Amino acid sequence: MSATAGTADESGVASAAASADERARAASLARELDEHAYRYYVLDSPTISDAEYDRLMAELAALEERHPDLRTPDSPTQKVAGSYSTLFTPVEHLERMLSLENVFDDDEFHQWAARVARESEVDAWLCELKIDGLAVDLVYEDGYLVRAATRGDGRTGEDITPNIRTLASVPVRLRGPRVPGLLEVRGEVFFPTAKFAELNAGLVAVGGKPFANPRNAAAGSLRQKDPRVTATRPLEMIVHGLGAQRGFEVTSQSAAYARFAELGLPVATHFEVLATVPGVLDYVHRWGDARHDVVHEIDGVVVKVDSFALQRRLGSTSKSPRWAVAYKYPPEEVTTKLRDIRVNVGRTGRVTPFGELEPVLVAGSTVGLATLHNIDEVGRKGVLIGDTVVLRKAGDVIPEIVGPVVDLREGSERAFVMPTRCPECGTELVRPEGEVDIRCPNTVSCPAQLRESIFHFASRGAMDIDGLGYETATALLEAGRVRDIGDIFHLTPESFEGLRGFAQKKIDQILRGVEAARHRPLWRLLVGLSIRHVGPTAARALARELRSLEAIAATSAEDLAAVEGVGPKIAGAVLDWFADERHRDILARIAAGGARLADVGAEEGPRPLDGVTVVITGTLTDWSRDSAKEAVEARGGKVTGSVSRKTTAVVVGADPGASKYDKARSLRIPMLDEAGFAVLLAQGVDAASKLAVPADGPEKAETPVE
């Protein structure tokens, strides 16, 4: 899933204030985009197509362009989409992994290339196929693979080293006599399309659930707890980017690829270095016609400035490099019959219409469902039940219906009528003012909302309860063993008596997961409560600042809104949630079940690093990156992945990242070695500042990030 970033208004011309409708639409778009990003990156279960996601993102970016006051630091247009789960250990990348800006036609590409040319003349563009796979970061030290991680949120991903080691295309040891001391590379893991149907047939034969498409097959195969399962899957990888490095001296992207190949790393065979924009567009269109002639799925072409010096000059925004762009191909389209239109009820009560289709093969997978988003979208597209419809899909789970083929209507088609009552519980549906969505307001007993909320509470992005998935949530609810998320921490072996499909091994797995969840940090509980607008970023900010649910509930709206990363909208939603008596009852049952409602040390008063922002770069001897981050956060501080004027101190270990080191020097931010870091943790900023490392030393070359 990709996102088109908005740009700041630099014209100096005052913008008209946004209307109430525009503000409501922007807020609605932000909520919807955050939800879809969470489903795509964390759950591996998207519910809209890439094209629809891009359309929503473009609409929000356009609103923010017209009214810059709508653009907030936590807007989806300002973030690298993605998150990381806790199924695997979180690890921080040495250099941040950014997402790419998208263009969708020749005119947009010309505009992007013209912006680049205003900075400097470009005499070489590197073009390569955009693989529709899973982004992965590899770290080699002295030639040996020491870590592999998913992209995650761009700063932190999941450690998948044992699984990556099973890929035949990924060398565990680099070749040649001149291996770099440190080399961080980025690439894409993919499932060859020719092997995809074979895998699904095997899964179905043993009663398993088939993957929807090759990208999901790659993600699911790579996220196996048992590397032996990953080893049975024919995964491959292509390396296409450079992160942190020491002893890897090249001056261009193409030279880096040549050096990668010398070291035994898998590189693309179809990239070309071209001198002109017309040459680039010829490459784009040539491969658009031949997109099915390669071993993996592609959804576009990535165009990069080849020169590393010019890449450094162009720099990056908060989410994407200015020196690279993804030219996205239009999604593939087929026609099929729309058999029916039904609705689905989500965890927040949102009622979403979807189409049931005659199964059809498109973009490498067979689909029988397509989202219609909301009742306004059904009307706008003009589709009738029984229509032959145009279906658009670009490697996604649920594609979108573009519209009807009116000429093929026979007269038997009929209009869809949105139900006035919830199909799950019978409650009258409502449409909140300023929203496009219709909702079921019955949060107490609507089976669909209860199922979805339990599934979300237990998901990897929230409380991460191993074994408590959708089917388990459904079984427990239908049998009356739980009422809602408040009963999860009261599950016992007896809760599963008489339920089909729950062997003792499965029950033990779930109960171990519940026990582990009792000790999760506060921010995960906040995410799991399904408070509207509260995602991982806001939850971390609230937990860091206030440290307990009791303190959060007792804080005024004004003070909550003042917390960095929160704001008035989230503050209002939080207090509305706590004001609901049913929610207070749920929290009481969660607490009675032994779960923590506060972070460790919350009752001990001010912490030594309250208000302190730390950046860690390089390798520490006595701390892993995760333990160092936890140590700072436990004392009230915040660890970020990039250096800015808000940074209090930079902790410098062995082999620090060049860009962080140089940025800290240029901003004269105190740099601490490992001894200074220990003092920072024990005694605070004032004591540690006396041990700051002098801001001098040899110049370090900045490495490009992707």
From Swiss-Prot:
GO biological process annotation, one example: DNA repair
Stored Gene3D superfamilies: 5' to 3' exonuclease, C-terminal subdomain (1.10.150.20), 6.20.10.30, BRCT domain (3.40.50.10190), DNA ligase/mRNA capping enzyme (3.30.470.30), Helix hairpin bin (1.10.287.610), Nucleic acid-binding proteins (2.40.50.140)
Enzyme superclass (EC): ligase
Region (Disordered) location: 1-20
Residues annotated as the enzyme's active site: 130 (n6-amp-lysine intermediate)
Catalytic activity: NAD(+) + (deoxyribonucleotide)n-3'-hydroxyl + 5'-phospho-(deoxyribonucleotide)m = (deoxyribonucleotide)n+m + AMP + beta-nicotinamide D-nucleotide
InterPro entries, per database record: BRCT_dom, BRCT_dom_sf, DisA/LigA_HHH, DNA_ligase, DNA_ligase_AS, DNA_ligase_CS, DNAligase_adenylation, DNAligase_N
Domain BRCT: 604-694
GO molecular function: DNA binding; DNA ligase (NAD+) activity; metal ion binding
PANTHER family: CHROMOSOME TRANSMISSION FIDELITY FACTOR 18, DNA LIGASE
Summary of the function given for this chain in its UniProt record: DNA ligase that catalyzes the formation of phosphodiester linkages between 5'-phosphoryl and 3'-hydroxyl groups in double-stranded DNA using NAD as a coenzyme and as the energy source for the reaction. It is essential for DNA replication and repair of damaged DNA.
NCBIfam families: dnlj, PRK07956.1
Protein name: DNA ligase
Gene name tied to this protein: ligA
